[in-house]
Protein backbone atom coordinates (compact mmCIF):
# COMPACT_ATOMS: atom_id res chain seq x y z
CA UNK A 1 0.00 0.00 0.00
CA UNK A 2 2.86 2.37 0.88
CA UNK A 3 4.56 1.45 -2.40
CA UNK A 4 1.40 2.44 -4.27
CA UNK A 5 1.26 5.73 -2.37
CA UNK A 6 4.90 6.56 -3.16
CA UNK A 7 4.29 5.70 -6.82
CA UNK A 8 1.33 8.10 -6.95
CA UNK A 9 3.36 10.87 -5.29
CA UNK A 10 6.21 10.34 -7.80
CA UNK A 11 3.80 10.57 -10.73
CA UNK A 12 2.27 13.77 -9.34
CA UNK A 13 5.69 15.36 -8.81
CA UNK A 14 6.78 14.42 -12.33
CA UNK A 15 3.61 15.91 -13.79
CA UNK A 16 4.07 19.08 -11.78
CA UNK A 17 7.62 19.54 -13.00
CA UNK A 18 6.74 19.20 -16.68
CA UNK A 19 6.90 22.44 -18.66
CA UNK A 20 5.52 23.55 -21.97
CA UNK A 21 7.59 25.44 -24.52
CA UNK A 22 6.01 28.70 -23.34
CA UNK A 23 6.90 28.01 -19.70
CA UNK A 24 10.37 26.63 -20.38
CA UNK A 25 12.64 27.62 -17.46
CA UNK A 26 15.74 29.67 -18.09
CA UNK A 27 17.97 27.49 -15.90
CA UNK A 28 20.21 25.30 -18.03
CA UNK A 29 23.48 23.42 -18.13
CA UNK A 30 25.05 26.73 -19.17
CA UNK A 31 23.89 28.58 -16.04
CA UNK A 32 26.32 31.39 -15.23
CA UNK A 33 28.71 30.26 -17.95
CA UNK A 34 31.54 31.15 -18.19
CA UNK A 35 32.14 32.61 -14.74
CA UNK A 36 31.96 29.31 -12.84
CA UNK A 37 33.85 26.39 -14.38
CA UNK A 38 34.28 27.36 -18.03
CA UNK A 39 37.74 26.65 -19.43
CA UNK A 40 38.43 28.39 -22.73
CA UNK A 41 41.11 25.83 -23.49
CA UNK A 42 38.38 23.20 -23.69
CA UNK A 43 36.96 24.95 -26.75
CA UNK A 44 40.07 24.18 -28.85
CA UNK A 45 40.06 21.08 -31.03
CA UNK A 46 43.03 19.74 -33.04
CA UNK A 47 42.47 18.89 -36.69
CA UNK A 48 43.44 15.22 -37.14
CA UNK A 49 46.06 14.62 -39.82
CA UNK A 50 43.83 12.15 -41.67
CA UNK A 51 41.04 14.74 -41.80
CA UNK A 52 43.44 17.47 -42.93
CA UNK A 53 44.75 15.28 -45.75
CA UNK A 54 41.18 14.56 -46.83
CA UNK A 55 40.23 18.24 -46.83
CA UNK A 56 43.33 19.18 -48.81
CA UNK A 57 42.64 16.59 -51.52
CA UNK A 58 41.49 17.66 -54.98
CA UNK A 59 38.10 19.37 -54.99
CA UNK A 60 36.56 16.67 -57.19
CA UNK A 61 37.47 13.95 -54.68
CA UNK A 62 34.65 12.87 -52.39
CA UNK A 63 34.99 13.53 -48.68
CA UNK A 64 35.59 10.30 -46.76
CA UNK A 65 33.08 8.85 -44.32
CA UNK A 66 35.70 9.21 -41.59
CA UNK A 67 35.87 12.99 -42.10
CA UNK A 68 32.09 13.35 -42.34
CA UNK A 69 31.57 11.38 -39.13
CA UNK A 70 34.26 13.40 -37.35
CA UNK A 71 32.59 16.67 -38.36
CA UNK A 72 29.09 15.49 -37.41
CA UNK A 73 30.25 14.36 -33.98
CA UNK A 74 32.06 17.65 -33.45
CA UNK A 75 28.95 19.68 -34.26
CA UNK A 76 26.70 17.55 -32.07
CA UNK A 77 29.02 17.43 -29.07
CA UNK A 78 30.46 20.94 -29.15
CA UNK A 79 28.00 23.18 -30.95
CA UNK A 80 24.51 21.94 -30.22
CA UNK A 81 24.94 20.34 -26.81
CA UNK A 82 28.19 21.83 -25.54
CA UNK A 83 29.64 25.31 -25.11
CA UNK A 84 27.93 26.65 -28.22
CA UNK A 85 31.18 27.11 -30.11
CA UNK A 86 34.50 25.39 -30.81
CA UNK A 87 37.82 26.39 -32.32
CA UNK A 88 39.88 24.27 -34.70
CA UNK A 89 43.44 24.89 -33.56
CA UNK A 90 45.30 26.61 -36.39
CA UNK A 91 48.64 25.23 -35.20
CA UNK A 92 47.50 21.88 -36.63
CA UNK A 93 47.93 23.27 -40.16
CA UNK A 94 50.03 26.41 -39.75
CA UNK A 95 52.06 25.79 -42.91
CA UNK A 96 49.09 26.36 -45.27
CA UNK A 97 49.08 29.45 -47.49
CA UNK A 98 45.92 31.58 -48.03
CA UNK A 99 44.83 29.76 -51.21
CA UNK A 100 45.15 26.43 -49.44
CA UNK A 101 43.12 27.77 -46.52
CA UNK A 102 40.34 28.85 -48.87
CA UNK A 103 40.39 25.37 -50.39
CA UNK A 104 40.27 23.78 -46.93
CA UNK A 105 37.32 25.95 -45.89
CA UNK A 106 35.34 25.14 -49.03
CA UNK A 107 35.87 21.42 -48.42
CA UNK A 108 35.21 21.64 -44.68
CA UNK A 109 32.03 23.73 -44.73
CA UNK A 110 29.67 21.11 -46.25
CA UNK A 111 30.95 18.57 -43.70
CA UNK A 112 29.84 20.78 -40.81
CA UNK A 113 26.35 21.54 -42.08
CA UNK A 114 24.34 22.95 -44.97
CA UNK A 115 26.02 26.17 -46.15
CA UNK A 116 23.78 29.11 -47.04
CA UNK A 117 24.27 31.54 -49.92
CA UNK A 118 22.42 34.82 -49.33
CA UNK A 119 22.48 38.12 -51.22
CA UNK A 120 20.47 41.11 -50.00
CA UNK A 121 20.66 44.89 -49.74
CA UNK A 122 22.33 44.46 -46.38
CA UNK A 123 25.06 41.94 -47.22
CA UNK A 124 26.41 39.33 -49.61
CA UNK A 125 27.16 35.83 -48.35
CA UNK A 126 28.64 33.21 -50.67
CA UNK A 127 29.78 29.68 -49.80
CA UNK A 128 32.95 31.33 -48.50
CA UNK A 129 32.95 35.11 -48.12
CA UNK A 130 35.94 37.36 -47.43
CA UNK A 131 35.64 39.49 -44.30
CA UNK A 132 37.91 42.52 -44.57
CA UNK A 133 37.88 46.20 -43.72
CA UNK A 134 36.37 47.83 -46.81
CA UNK A 135 36.55 51.33 -45.41
CA UNK A 136 32.96 51.47 -44.13
CA UNK A 137 32.64 53.79 -41.14
CA UNK A 138 29.53 54.10 -38.97
CA UNK A 139 27.99 57.52 -38.41
CA UNK A 140 25.11 56.15 -36.35
CA UNK A 141 24.36 53.13 -34.16
CA UNK A 142 21.46 52.47 -36.54
CA UNK A 143 23.72 52.11 -39.59
CA UNK A 144 26.05 49.16 -39.15
CA UNK A 145 27.75 46.64 -41.42
CA UNK A 146 30.26 45.05 -39.09
CA UNK A 147 32.02 42.83 -41.61
CA UNK A 148 33.06 45.78 -43.81
CA UNK A 149 34.48 48.00 -41.10
CA UNK A 150 37.31 48.07 -38.57
CA UNK A 151 35.10 49.64 -35.90
CA UNK A 152 33.79 47.79 -32.87
CA UNK A 153 31.00 45.30 -33.56
CA UNK A 154 28.71 45.12 -30.55
CA UNK A 155 27.07 41.88 -29.38
CA UNK A 156 24.64 40.46 -31.92
CA UNK A 157 23.42 37.32 -33.65
CA UNK A 158 23.73 36.91 -37.41
CA UNK A 159 20.97 37.48 -40.00
CA UNK A 160 18.37 38.82 -37.56
CA UNK A 161 16.63 40.56 -40.45
CA UNK A 162 15.74 37.24 -42.08
CA UNK A 163 12.47 35.40 -41.32
CA UNK A 164 14.56 32.35 -40.41
CA UNK A 165 18.05 33.33 -39.17
CA UNK A 166 21.02 31.07 -39.78
CA UNK A 167 21.79 28.26 -37.36
CA UNK A 168 25.57 28.60 -37.19
CA UNK A 169 28.55 30.28 -38.82
CA UNK A 170 32.26 29.68 -39.37
CA UNK A 171 35.13 32.16 -39.29
CA UNK A 172 38.58 31.15 -40.55
CA UNK A 173 41.29 33.59 -39.46
CA UNK A 174 43.60 33.90 -42.45
CA UNK A 175 45.41 36.97 -41.12
CA UNK A 176 45.02 38.62 -37.69
CA UNK A 177 44.92 42.41 -37.49
CA UNK A 178 48.00 44.46 -36.73
CA UNK A 179 46.28 45.56 -33.52
CA UNK A 180 42.98 44.62 -31.85
CA UNK A 181 40.16 42.64 -33.45
CA UNK A 182 39.56 40.13 -30.63
CA UNK A 183 36.21 38.32 -30.64
CA UNK A 184 33.75 38.46 -27.75
CA UNK A 185 31.02 35.97 -26.88
CA UNK A 186 27.99 35.84 -24.59
CA UNK A 187 26.03 32.64 -23.97
CA UNK A 188 22.33 33.49 -24.35
CA UNK A 189 21.28 30.80 -21.84
CA UNK A 190 23.47 32.46 -19.23
CA UNK A 191 22.17 35.88 -20.20
CA UNK A 192 18.55 34.78 -19.72
CA UNK A 193 19.39 33.06 -16.44
CA UNK A 194 20.82 36.33 -15.13
CA UNK A 195 17.93 38.46 -16.44
CA UNK A 196 15.41 36.08 -14.85
CA UNK A 197 17.23 36.39 -11.52
CA UNK A 198 16.89 40.17 -11.72
CA UNK A 199 13.17 39.97 -12.59
CA UNK A 200 11.30 37.03 -14.20
CA UNK A 201 9.15 39.58 -16.05
CA UNK A 202 12.22 40.48 -18.12
CA UNK A 203 11.90 37.19 -20.00
CA UNK A 204 8.20 37.74 -20.69
CA UNK A 205 9.04 41.03 -22.38
CA UNK A 206 11.73 39.44 -24.56
CA UNK A 207 9.20 36.84 -25.73
CA UNK A 208 7.02 39.56 -27.23
CA UNK A 209 7.33 40.27 -30.98
CA UNK A 210 9.77 43.03 -31.96
CA UNK A 211 10.46 44.52 -35.36
CA UNK A 212 14.02 44.14 -36.67
CA UNK A 213 14.64 46.78 -39.35
CA UNK A 214 17.88 47.17 -41.33
CA UNK A 215 16.85 50.68 -42.50
CA UNK A 216 17.54 49.33 -46.00
CA UNK A 217 14.03 48.12 -46.76
CA UNK A 218 14.30 44.83 -44.86
CA UNK A 219 12.05 44.38 -41.84
CA UNK A 220 10.86 41.29 -39.96
CA UNK A 221 8.77 40.81 -36.81
CA UNK A 222 9.95 38.20 -34.31
CA UNK A 223 10.39 37.63 -30.57
CA UNK A 224 13.90 38.11 -29.22
CA UNK A 225 13.48 34.86 -27.27
CA UNK A 226 11.72 31.81 -28.70
CA UNK A 227 12.19 28.04 -28.96
CA UNK A 228 12.16 25.65 -31.90
CA UNK A 229 10.07 22.49 -32.15
CA UNK A 230 12.71 20.54 -30.20
CA UNK A 231 12.73 23.09 -27.37
CA UNK A 232 16.11 24.58 -28.32
CA UNK A 233 16.65 28.27 -27.63
CA UNK A 234 16.39 30.67 -30.57
CA UNK A 235 17.84 34.01 -29.45
CA UNK A 236 17.70 36.88 -31.95
CA UNK A 237 19.53 40.13 -31.23
CA UNK A 238 20.85 43.09 -33.20
CA UNK A 239 20.46 46.24 -31.16
CA UNK A 240 20.67 48.61 -34.14
CA UNK A 241 17.90 46.76 -35.99
CA UNK A 242 15.72 46.61 -32.86
CA UNK A 243 16.14 50.38 -32.45
CA UNK A 244 15.35 50.92 -36.13
CA UNK A 245 12.18 48.87 -35.67
CA UNK A 246 11.09 50.69 -32.54
CA UNK A 247 8.45 52.89 -34.30
CA UNK A 248 6.75 49.70 -35.55
CA UNK A 249 6.93 47.83 -32.22
CA UNK A 250 3.66 49.15 -30.80
CA UNK A 251 4.07 47.64 -27.34
CA UNK A 252 7.31 49.57 -26.72
CA UNK A 253 6.96 51.40 -23.42
CA UNK A 254 9.06 52.27 -20.37
CA UNK A 255 9.09 48.63 -19.24
CA UNK A 256 10.35 47.45 -22.62
CA UNK A 257 13.05 50.12 -22.62
CA UNK A 258 14.11 49.05 -19.13
CA UNK A 259 14.41 45.40 -20.22
CA UNK A 260 16.40 46.31 -23.35
CA UNK A 261 18.76 48.41 -21.21
CA UNK A 262 19.13 45.58 -18.68
CA UNK A 263 19.88 43.12 -21.49
CA UNK A 264 22.63 45.36 -22.86
CA UNK A 265 24.26 45.94 -19.48
CA UNK A 266 24.07 42.26 -18.53
CA UNK A 267 25.77 41.28 -21.79
CA UNK A 268 28.75 43.40 -20.79
CA UNK A 269 29.05 41.48 -17.51
CA UNK A 270 29.00 38.06 -19.18
CA UNK A 271 31.44 38.55 -22.06
CA UNK A 272 34.42 36.34 -22.67
CA UNK A 273 37.15 37.37 -25.07
CA UNK A 274 38.75 35.06 -27.64
CA UNK A 275 41.78 36.14 -29.66
CA UNK A 276 42.03 33.94 -32.73
CA UNK A 277 45.52 33.08 -33.93
CA UNK A 278 46.43 32.78 -37.59
CA UNK A 279 44.72 29.69 -39.00
CA UNK A 280 42.20 29.23 -36.18
CA UNK A 281 38.69 28.32 -37.33
CA UNK A 282 35.84 29.12 -34.97
CA UNK A 283 32.36 27.65 -35.47
CA UNK A 284 29.52 29.27 -33.51
CA UNK A 285 25.92 28.33 -32.71
CA UNK A 286 24.06 31.46 -33.85
CA UNK A 287 20.87 30.62 -31.93
CA UNK A 288 22.48 30.49 -28.47
CA UNK A 289 25.61 32.63 -28.77
CA UNK A 290 25.96 36.37 -29.24
CA UNK A 291 29.22 37.50 -30.74
CA UNK A 292 31.07 40.78 -31.09
CA UNK A 293 34.45 42.10 -32.18
CA UNK A 294 36.81 44.70 -30.78
CA UNK A 295 37.88 47.54 -33.03
CA UNK A 296 41.10 46.84 -34.90
CA UNK A 297 43.86 48.57 -36.83
CA UNK A 298 45.68 47.56 -39.98
CA UNK A 299 49.16 48.87 -40.76
CA UNK A 300 50.94 49.54 -44.09
CA UNK A 301 53.82 47.26 -43.07
CA UNK A 302 51.53 44.45 -41.90
CA UNK A 303 49.13 42.29 -43.95
CA UNK A 304 45.53 43.47 -43.38
CA UNK A 305 43.09 41.52 -41.24
CA UNK A 306 41.37 38.83 -43.32
CA UNK A 307 38.84 36.20 -42.34
CA UNK A 308 36.71 33.75 -44.30
CA UNK A 309 33.05 33.34 -43.31
CA UNK A 310 30.48 30.63 -44.00
CA UNK A 311 26.84 30.57 -42.90
CA UNK A 312 24.97 27.36 -42.09
CA UNK A 313 21.26 26.61 -42.14
State each model region's role.
Residues 81-128:
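Long, mid-chain structured domain cores
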Residues 6-75, 79-86, 94-95, 126-313:
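Active-site environment of non-heme Fe oxygenases that use a 2-His-1-carboxylate facial triad
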